[in-house]
């Protein structure tokens, strides 16, 4: 019989009953009701568990179990069935963090975007226009070509006023804008931005595929985020390849340099702790006492931005003690085979003093060989003459199968012994000029250098080796003259005593750690590691900092060794199933010519930040150079676009479709004819690049899609410039361009445009900053509501996303949204009877193609100045022709096109057939049966089908493809390599398999390490062990980069460059109110969010101050009467932030931290400086583009999407901080 439930009143009367005690009153009998336990049981009950992950660019890519009850996600928990790492190694689990554990809050939060929304002003204009114009394109034209109408909805951005709309209506509006733009201005005025595909590959590929099919450019992100380390392409010819976090455990000595591992790599931090338990020594280099400092045996509190000085001094010690005072055999042999130390460099002589020039090549020494301008020479000790070693860039492309690191002369086939130095065979000890940079003015150092004289081609030629130049550069005392440091106490650049003045670190500590780092490499055979990160990568001169740091791992032979080398972790960059993803994301299966634009250049011009440059580029140039080519940064970008170094979309001041018609009318019958026509029009200045007049309305970007990103409030460096010039809405910019530097190559328009974009379309599941400024917001599915894939460099697995619940309300997955949009575009093209078109497309000179041999010797020849002929694909961009039929966009979007079978697949210069895999996908995915252009193709209409296709077509997830890939590389190198993948040749990952349990990827030449036999992944191990060259000019790791522009800026070798000198205001500034202080403004990663994600979630907001904060040193705050938790204004001419002050002794004096991506929709009051709310963390920022990062068409310095290009750095700036006099929430 069921017990009758008593009322709460009677239950309370139990407290008056006597209590029965036992065991000397150590226990008692109670009669309380235990029904409350059911609440707990119900809370943790569930109907099903689904494996998924988080797509948030945290680099974690952790596997999570999602628990569902009655169709509601109730909680998530860490998955525990990762494959074992093997004996004597810690396992990967547990992986996760409190941020990820709180994600399910978003699904049902007030921030959830549940329906499509359109700005009210815009939707009313659209509805009225449709009543007047039957043709939707004419309806859209009547809005955007009417200045008053366009201004009315653009000025409403960021000010609310959204109304709910129906999917068909919204899709038609977007489609009309897209097709109108295609016909009026050109397809390249429709732009897409979505970052970090590895964090959710299918979602990224959905929009990228759509943009590629309609001819719109995709913007890069890795460089724009300043996550890209440009030094990696410069040194290795590789974007970024780093060890998985488990490889830290193999290390014997670890330096964390600008990387706060416990905070930013939370799921992986246990490996660092475990390595230390095992006996590894850990050094922390950080200005503040960061979380990573608590792991350390030694903490070097460095002055921010001076890391390059410390690294140069450490390099000085290692070179002095382990190369000169006593030659370390392992280091010497490593340097000869795997670095460019023995390669010969030419010298020019003027007034008895020498200057380093370019490499000596086969052409210079009279060797008759293919690509003789791309084969640098060494001095062979065995023959006492020149030799051309195998493995150079020229041998990569000459078809002779000699692209390997065997120490053999490629012409004679004889073994060689490269000489590291010409000292001992020199003809002279001369004086070489070395550029030196400081805030007190750049100057020239004179150093002693051994020099050999040779008569080549009838001319006296002076040569030395890279090794000799490096020793001179570091000021190492070789006993050959008096122009070097006498001891470590000598304040000459770059000694330990010199760096102490720069960094504040005692010279004794520098000597000690440099010795330990090198000695550990000797004792452990190279297991010395440096973990680097955003702390040193977000500066203007991050590449010179990194080169100085990375020289250390090269000097001790640590690179290419498990437990050694560099470990750069900024951004979830490693997309492991690369070839399959690339095929689908760029629509190579159909079109084959994607437009891949570097993001930094795009935003620099689109937001008009180029108009506000105030520091002449000549201040940054080498004191050895006669002068800088230009005074304005933007001029170098124009040069880069003109010479084919960088992409530039929009490309021309003319619609690419109309340009093709003109070329055809002029008699062009082939793509080559079209290229010649375009080149002639450019030379005659009848046609111009759009970048030469970016403020002309015909050159504006018109439609911008943003998905999987919070561009406006997270990554939009120069936030207020975005609001003013790109969006045309209320902004907090306190800068003007009246006294800025004027460019030479760009037309200056006195009135800067405001509101360039016609539409900003955002796909998101939460109403974040970008959504609040968008014209249209489309409701996206969360990570627990769709099929997708994720991978990272931190572990070797590919993780799935899976729908624990169906996408609620009217939300859709990104794949389904772009699929629906492609249908709408095709339907509208049918409705207006849009004919197929042909478009002229310009693409840059690409890395890993023959185009990286386009411009020999690193010499700049500008056809626009008459220095050479304009030749497409050689001295200017490639010119191609692409046909598009907008009626077929939907059919192509949802089918895997025939090019997969007809054309080779590949990556990094390799290629192979995947026709068999294409046929197997027809069987597994089904074929398209509709009577369309896609009939008979594999069906990828669903996201899961697209994921299966990616896994099947990629060498890291399909063993047969991996073997084909290695065979392709064997054909180039004449090495035996496919054994790296043969043991797993029969494996082919499926979505169901990786859902059941994570699988370690297959070893592939798409990357440079090996997972064979359960090995922990470490980069460049296949280069070292298998003798595969690096993809650089010499085929080796580069200490010396000899491009003319690198010489202009004094960066042929690693050096120290101080941070830019920035003043918060120039001629005009707001009135001073009370006490103020000027501080260096840094925006490191946040403890309570991952970028802007989780910042606005209730669980994370409750853990700290519940809104935006700025961290200050307590003494700096005391000087300005600021107390902890006071409201402050943090501002300069770029914008203003209003936040609470967090005072801490862990922050050094002279700097302020504002953790990045604190969105402005949570607890942000107003400021009288702008009479508006405070801005985002990026309001005080403005980007600075660096010319040396624009180089292209030259070996490893050639363009690749997210591979090389100027970074969106933002740290070289200062702000004024003062107490906010009155907190005004602007609610009246």
From Swiss-Prot:
EC number(s) on file: 1.7.5.1
Keywords: 4Fe-4S, Cell membrane, Electron transport, Iron, Iron-sulfur, Membrane, Metal-binding, Molybdenum, Nitrate assimilation, Oxidoreductase, Transport
Highest taxon listed in the record's lineage: Bacteria
Sample GO molecular function, one term: metal ion binding
Subcellular location: Cell membrane
Membrane spanning stretches: none
Limits of the 4Fe-4S Mo/W bis-MGD-type domain: 47-111
Residue positions binding Mo-bis(molybdopterin guanine dinucleotide): 227
Coiled-coil regions, chain positions: none
Binding, [4Fe-4S] cluster: 54, 58, 62, 97
GO cellular component: membrane; nitrate reductase complex; plasma membrane
Catalytic reaction equation(s): nitrate + a quinol = a quinone + nitrite + H2O
Annotated function: The alpha chain is the actual site of nitrate reduction.
Homology family: Belongs to the prokaryotic molybdopterin-containing oxidoreductase family.
Protein name: Nitrate reductase alpha chain
């Amino acid at each position: 019989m069921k017990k009758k439930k008593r009322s709460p009143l009677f239950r309370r009367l139990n407290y008056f009953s006597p209590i029965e005690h036992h065991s000397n009153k150590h226990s008692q009998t109670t009669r309380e009701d235990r029904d409350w336990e059911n609440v707990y049981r119900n809370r943790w009950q569930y109907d099903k568990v689904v494996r998924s992950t988080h797509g948030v660019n945290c680099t974690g890519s952790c596997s999570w179990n999602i628990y569902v009850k009655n169709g509601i996600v109730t909680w998530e928990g860490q998955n525990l069935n990762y494959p074992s790492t093997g004996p004597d190694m810690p396992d990967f689990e547990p992986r996760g963090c409190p941020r990820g554990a709180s994600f399910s809050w978003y699904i049902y939060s007030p921030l959830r975007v549940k329906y499509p929304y359109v700005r009210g002003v815009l939707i009313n204009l659209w509805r009225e226009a449709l009543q007047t114009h039957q043709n939707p394109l004419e309806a859209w034209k009547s809005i955007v070509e009417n200045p008053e109408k366009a201004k009315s909805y653009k000025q409403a951005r960021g000010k609310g006023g959204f109304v709910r709309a129906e999917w068909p209506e919204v899709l038609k509006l977007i489609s009309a804008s897209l097709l109108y733009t295609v016909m009026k201005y050109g397809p390249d005025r429709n732009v897409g931005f979505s970052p970090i595909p590895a964090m959710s590959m299918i979602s990224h590929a959905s929009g990228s595929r759509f943009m590629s099919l309609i001819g719109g450019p995709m913007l890069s992100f890795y460089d724009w985020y300043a996550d890209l380390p440009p030094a990696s392409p410069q040194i290795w010819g590789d974007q970024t390849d780093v060890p998985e976090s488990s490889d830290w455990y193999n290390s014997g000595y670890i330096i964390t340099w600008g990387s706060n591992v416990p905070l930013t790599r939370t799921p992986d931090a246990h490996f660092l702790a475990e390595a230390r338990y095992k006996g590894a020594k850990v050094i922390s280099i950080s200005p503040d006492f960061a979380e990573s400092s608590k792991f350390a045996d030694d903490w070097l509190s460095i002055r921010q931005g001076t890391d390059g000085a410390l690294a140069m001094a450490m390099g000085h010690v290692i070179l002095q003690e382990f190369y000169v005072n006593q030659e370390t055999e392992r280091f010497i042999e490593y340097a000869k085979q795997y670095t460019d130390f023995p390669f010969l460099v030419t010298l020019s002589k003027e007034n008895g003093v020498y200057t380093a020039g370019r490499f000596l090549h086969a052409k210079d020494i009279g060797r008759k060989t293919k690509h003789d301008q791309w084969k640098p020479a060494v001095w062979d000790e065995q023959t006492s003459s020149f030799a051309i070693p195998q493995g150079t860039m020229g041998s990569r492309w000459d078809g002779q199968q000699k692209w390997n690191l065997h120490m053999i002369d490629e012409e004679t086939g004889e073994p060689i012994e490269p000489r590291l130095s010409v000292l001992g065979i020199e003809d002279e000890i001369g004086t070489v000029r070395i550029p030196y940079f400081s805030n007190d003015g750049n100057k020239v150092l004179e150093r002693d250098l051994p020099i050999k004289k040779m008569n080549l081609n009838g001319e006296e030629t002076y040569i030395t080796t890279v090794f000799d130049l490096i020793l001179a550069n570091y000021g190492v005392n070789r006993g050959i003259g008096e122009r070097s440091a006498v001891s470590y106490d000598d304040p000459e650049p770059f000694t330990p005593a010199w760096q102490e003045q720069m960094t504040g670190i005692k010279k004794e500590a520098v000597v000690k750690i440099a010795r330990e780092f090198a000695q550990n490499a000797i004792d452990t055979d190279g297991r010395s590691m440096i973990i680097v990160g955003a702390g040193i990568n977000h500066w203007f001169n991050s590449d010179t900092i990194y080169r100085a740091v990375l020289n250390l791992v090269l000097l001790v032979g640590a690179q290419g060794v498990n437990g050694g080398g560099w470990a750069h972790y900024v951004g979830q960059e490693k997309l492991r199933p690369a070839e399959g993803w690339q095929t689908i994301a760029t629509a190579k299966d159909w079109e084959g010519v994607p437009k891949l634009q570097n993001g930094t250049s795009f935003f620099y011009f689109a937001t008009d930040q180029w108009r506000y440059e105030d520091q002449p580029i000549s201040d940054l140039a080498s004191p050895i150079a006669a002068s800088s080519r230009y005074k304005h940064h933007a001029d170098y970008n124009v040069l880069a676009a003109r010479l084919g170094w960088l992409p530039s979309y929009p490309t021309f001041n003319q619609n690419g479709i109309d340009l093709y018609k003109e070329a055809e009318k002029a008699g062009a019958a082939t793509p080559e004819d079209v290229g010649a026509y375009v080149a002639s029009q450019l030379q005659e200045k009848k046609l111009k690049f759009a970048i030469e007049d970016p403020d002309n309305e015909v050159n504006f970007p018109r439609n911008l899609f943003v998905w999987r990103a919070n561009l406006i409030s997270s990554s939009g460096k120069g936030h207020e410039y975005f609001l003013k010039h790109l969006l045309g809405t209320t902004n907090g910019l306190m800068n003007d361009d009246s006294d800025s530097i004027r460019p030479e190559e760009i037309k200056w328009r006195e009135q800067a445009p405001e509101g360039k974009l016609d539409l900003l379309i955002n796909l998101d599941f939460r109403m974040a900053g970008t959504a609040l400024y968008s014209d249209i917001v489309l409701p996206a599915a969360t990570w627990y509501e769709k099929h997708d894939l994720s991978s990272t460099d931190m572990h070797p697995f590919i993780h799935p996303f899976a729908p624990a619940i169906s996408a609620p309300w009217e939300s859709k997955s990104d794949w389904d949204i772009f699929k629906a949009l492609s249908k709408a575009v095709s339907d509208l093209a049918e409705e207006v009877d849009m004919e197929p078109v042909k478009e002229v497309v310009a693409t840059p000179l690409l890395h890993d193609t023959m185009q990286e041999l386009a411009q020999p010797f690193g010499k700049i020849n500008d056809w626009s100045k008459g220095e050479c002929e304009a030749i497409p694909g050689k001295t200017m961009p490639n010119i191609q022709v692409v046909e598009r039929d907008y009626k077929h966009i939907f059919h192509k979007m949802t089918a895997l096109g025939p090019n997969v079978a007809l054309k080779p697949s590949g990556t990094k210069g390799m290629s192979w057939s995947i026709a068999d895999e294409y046929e197997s996908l027809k069987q597994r995915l089904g074929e398209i049966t509709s009577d369309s252009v896609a009939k008979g193709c594999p069906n990828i209409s669903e996201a899961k089908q697209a994921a299966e296709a990616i896994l099947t077509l990629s060498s890291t997830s399909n063993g047969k493809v991996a073997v084909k890939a290695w065979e392709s590389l064997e054909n180039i190198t004449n090495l035996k390599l496919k054994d790296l993948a043969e043991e797993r040749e029969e494996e082919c990952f499926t979505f169901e398999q990786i859902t059941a349990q994570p699988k370690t990827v297959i070893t592939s030449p798409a990357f440079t390490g090996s997972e064979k036999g359960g090995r922990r992944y470490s980069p460049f191990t296949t280069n070292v062990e298998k003798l595969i060259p690096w993809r650089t000019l010499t085929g080796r790791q580069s200490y010396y980069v000899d491009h003319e522009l690198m010489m202009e800026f004094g960066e042929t070798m690693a050096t120290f460059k101080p941070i830019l000198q920035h003043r918060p205001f120039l001629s005009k500034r707001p009135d001073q109110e009370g006490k103020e202080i000027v501080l260096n403004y840094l925006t490191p990663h946040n403890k309570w969010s991952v970028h802007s994600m989780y910042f606005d979630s209730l669980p994370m907001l409750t853990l700290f101050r519940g809104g935006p904060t700025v961290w200050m040193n307590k003494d700096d705050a005391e000087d300005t009467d600021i107390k902890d938790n006071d409201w402050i204004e943090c501002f300069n001419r770029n914008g203003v932030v209003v936040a609470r002050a967090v005072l801490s002794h862990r922050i050094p004096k002279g700097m302020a931290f504002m953790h990045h991506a604190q969105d402005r929709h949570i607890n942000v009051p107003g400021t009288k400086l702008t009479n508006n709310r405070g801005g985002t963390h990026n309001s005080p920022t403005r980007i600075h583009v660096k010319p040396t990062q624009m180089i292209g068409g030259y070996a490893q310095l050639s363009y690749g999407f997210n591979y090389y290009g100027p970074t969106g750095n933002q740290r070289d700036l200062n702000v004024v901080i003062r107490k906010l006099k009155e907190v005004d929430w602007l609610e009246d």
